[in-house]
A protein has these predicted regions:
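Structured catalytic/nucleic-acid-binding cores of DNA maintenance enzymes
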Residues: 1-279
Length: 279
């Protein structure tokens, strides 16, 4: 599933394919942008912010913006979120597209040297670049961004000491980029139960620092591994391994719902911790 490293990699794919080029055509297949034509627009750069992808463009002088706004000469951002199932793919002109149903395509961007296709994208919006904060300003420090600040991430998490550490790591307002895979793997490696209250976690700084290290290690490759192995079936310690033996102690890995997501953990290596004491 797309997590911060996947979105970072996707942004680099679009950067290589489109940055510095002028679009020769566009096709939006979502109601809010159905009438938008980006032909002649210049792609400046592709960037990621947590799980959000930002494609920044400049409209040619005299070109109307979305819904008749004044767009000419202005900088705009095409925002998309991959959530659980979205993806961008870049192809050479004439290359056969991936075998995905056509009804999943949300946008097609064409330049002289590349075709970028967005599948099952969410929160697709075209906004002035100077208004990006309206879409990503709520996010915590980006684990793969220049603003990464473990102290700030810890401060945000510690503000809700009763929240479970499993849910706190997934809350993008605390730190941006962790998804379910990294949540499960980080907590296993730290020996912390996902149900532990944030206020009872012995070393929050160590926890978020490990999360950043794991995501950073997977930048530039599509196979996500936390074990050091890229072999099929050997890339995770607990995630996706329900009922299989723990790689450390041999106990069967468990799977259970935590909040709105499932979590995987080893009941021996990640023992339950006592709840916070009352006032």
């Amino acid at each position: 599933m797309p997590e911060g490293d996947t979105v970072w990699n996707t942004a680099r794919v679009l950067q290589r394919a489109l940055a510095g080029t002028r679009l020769t055509g566009s096709d939006f297949r979502v109601p809010q942008l159905a009438a938008t034509d980006l032909t002649g627009w210049t792609v400046r750069e592709s960037d990621s912010r947590g799980k959000h992808l930002l494609l920044r463009l400049t409209a040619p002088t005299g070109t109307p913006g979305p819904e008749g706004t004044s767009g000419g000469g202005r900088d705009w951002t095409l925002h998309s979120h991959l959530r659980m199932d979205g993806a961008w793919r870049a192809y050479a002109p004439g290359e056969r597209w991936a075998a995905r149903p056509a009804h999943l395509i949300r946008v097609v961007l064409r330049s002289a040297g590349a075709v970028a296709v967005g599948y099952h994208l969410h929160e697709l919006a075209l906004i002035p670049t100077d208004q990006e904060q309206s879409l990503v300003g709520h996010l915590g420090p980006d684990l793969l961004g220049p603003d990464w600040d473990p102290a700030e991430a810890v401060r945000r998490m510690a503000a809700q000491p009763e929240a479970t550490i499993g849910e706190a790591l997934l809350d993008q307002r605390n730190l941006a980029g962790v998804g379910n895979l990294y949540k499960c793997e980080v907590l296993f490696l730290r020996g912390v139960s996902p149900w532990t209250p944030v206020g009872a976690v012995p070393d929050l700084t160590g926890t978020v620092t490990l999360a950043q290290r794991l995501l950073a290690a997977n930048r530039g490759r599509w196979t996500q591994s936390t074990t050091g192995s890229l072999h099929r079936g050997q890339t995770s310690y607990v995630y996706g391994r329900r009922a299989q033996p723990c790689r450390r102690c041999g106990t069967a890995i468990r799977k259970e719902e935590l909040g709105e997501r499932v979590t995987y953990w080893c009941p021996v290596c990640q023992p339950e911790r006592p709840a916070l004491a009352g006032p």
